[in-house]
A protein has these predicted regions:
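C-terminal beta-strand-loop-alpha-helix "lid" module of Rossmann-like NAD(P)-dependent dehydrogenases
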Residues: 1-185
Length: 185
């Protein structure tokens, strides 16, 4: 229950952060950060999979893994290679059975994982994208609906997509210091 409340409390901050990044990116059209550069010719993608360390979660992990496999297969049919970072021992043990390149994992993180425990494995994907070794990075997790229902999600993490222009005002009165290019870096 505490974890659910923490997740609910963080949602508005995450939404606003994405919106602010979109505003900053639009404010400086001369500069495109590597994380925002769209790559139309997709040759390799990465998935960051968030799962549990223990079982007894009903279909929580299996629904997510099925959703990821469907997405992965659609990319592989197009000749795209796949890399995975698994957070949680259930994801590691599941995806080892498939012909997937697991480039990093973090397991046994406990009830309240610290950012330091995740930075290394997540950075593997970020660096690969920045160095043009990956063309897309997806974040895969179960979205909490209620205690009886979670919805498997596969969301694009990179390239960062700015908010739809229809949701944005024609102008905004933010002053960014330092300049937007430095903030995006």
């Amino acid at each position: 229950r505490k974890a659910q409340e923490r997740m609910k409390a963080l949602r508005p901050y995450a939404r606003m952060m994405r919106k602010i990044v979109g505003h900053i990116a639009r404010a400086n059209t001369d500069y495109v950060h590597p994380f925002m550069a769209d790559r139309s010719d997709v040759k390799r993608i990465g998935y960051i999979v968030l799962s549990t360390d223990r079982g007894l979660c009903g279909g929580l992990n299996s629904q997510l893994f099925r959703r990821i496999l469907l997405d992965m297969r659609s990319w592989q049919e197009k000749g795209v290679e796949v890399d995975l970072v698994c957070v949680g021992s259930k994801a590691v043990s599941f995806f080892k059975r498939f012909n997937v390149n697991i480039v990093g994992s973090a397991v046994q993180l406990g009830e309240q994982p610290h950012v330091e425990q995740l930075v290394g494995v997540i950075k593997v994907m970020l660096d690969s994208f920045e160095n043009s070794n990956l063309d897309r990075v997806y974040l895969c997790y179960n979205d909490f609906v209620n205690t009886m229902s979670q919805k498997p999600e596969v969301k694009t993490l990179l390239p960062v997509e700015a908010d739809d222009k229809k949701d944005l005002p024609t102008y905004w009165d933010y002053i960014y210091e330092p300049d937007p290019a430095e903030l995006l870096d």
